[in-house]
Amino acid sequence: MVSKRLSHQTGHRRKFLAIIDETPECRRAVEYASRRAKNTSGALTLLYIIDSSEFQNFLGVGDIMRAEAHERAYATLAQIKTEVCDIVGIEPETIICEGQKADQIARVINDDQDIAVLILAAGASIDGPGPLVQSIASKGSAFSIPVTIIPDGLSDEDIDSVT
């Protein structure tokens, strides 16, 4: 069960959660979420999830792989955070965690009662909207917050007009 949202209570701000990864659609989700947060006096949380299954079965090498994954996560988050600050003028919160994406997203939402909307972006692949969107859609009942999926074809102007 997901905890009660506090984002509309005194002393709290509504947070928009964007998932950060190496996919091109990730940037569209961040663009929408950051503009929505700014235009509604909310906040932005950027979540990078490291798939720990990639290095669990390698003894000494697993620690090196984990450290490299964390370095990539920090670098990616730092770059996106800088872009958001420069372009939109807000400073996002950043979180790095390890595990299965849908489970970690649910945990972060449950732990932070100010997170009120999960923002994802659909990919342009002929195979569908992307593995993250498909995974979240299959676990939709696990989230007690709205999930907004940004279509691939939205231009910057379109995003500006709907945020």
Features from the language model and the residues they span:
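A short acidic, amphipathic alpha-helical/loop segment
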Residues: R28-Y32, R107-V108, S135
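Acidic, proline/glycine-rich short linear motifs
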Residues: Y48-A75, E157-T163
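Charged docking surfaces used in two-component/phosphorelay signaling
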Residues: I96-Q104
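Short helix-capping segments at alpha-helix termini
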Residues: V84-V88
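Rossmann-fold cofactor-recognition segment
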Residues: P92-T94
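Small/aliphatic-rich secondary-structure junction motif
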Residues: T10-G60, F143
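Gly/Ser-rich helix-loop-strand patches that form or flank binding pockets
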Residues: M1-R5, N110-T163
